[in-house]
């Protein structure tokens, strides 16, 4: 089933987040960026339609904090998440939480689903 994305949460940082913001804007999709204190002045943060600070000192507290990202997903009304690469892009529990929140996870193969299940 096709899903039309209207608002995209970008759950990553740096160059990948910038590329996703640019592409989404070209497609007419509203963007939501997340950032840590160290990324506050990054270009992707300025280019996004909305941006939310991830409080914390470690990646575990920020970009790997599944529940915090799902809260932002819900708060912003985003209907899709682009995880970029690394961080949560291959974490089955995050994919399930995104789905449970009524949004879709955009990713490329291989799937972040558990490859051990048949």
Question: What are these language model-derived features?
Answer:
Residues 107-113:
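Conserved small/polar residues in nucleotide/adenosyl-binding loops
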Residues 1-106:
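ATP-binding N-terminal substructure of ATP-dependent carboxylate-amine bond-forming enzymes
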């Amino acid at each position: 089933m096709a899903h039309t994305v209207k608002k995209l949460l970008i759950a990553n940082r740096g160059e990948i987040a910038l590329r996703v913001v640019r592409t989404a804007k070209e497609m007419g999709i509203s963007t939501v960026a997340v950032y840590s204190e160290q990324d506050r002045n990054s270009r992707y943060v300025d280019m996004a339609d909305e941006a939310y600070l991830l409080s914390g000192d470690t990646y575990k507290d920020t970009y790997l904090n599944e529940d915090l990202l799902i809260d932002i997903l819900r708060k912003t009304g985003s209907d899709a998440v682009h995880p970029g690469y690394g961080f949560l892009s291959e974490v089955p529990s995050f994919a399930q939480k995104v789905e449970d929140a009524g949004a879709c996870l955009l990713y490329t193969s291989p799937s972040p689903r558990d490859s051990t299940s048949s």
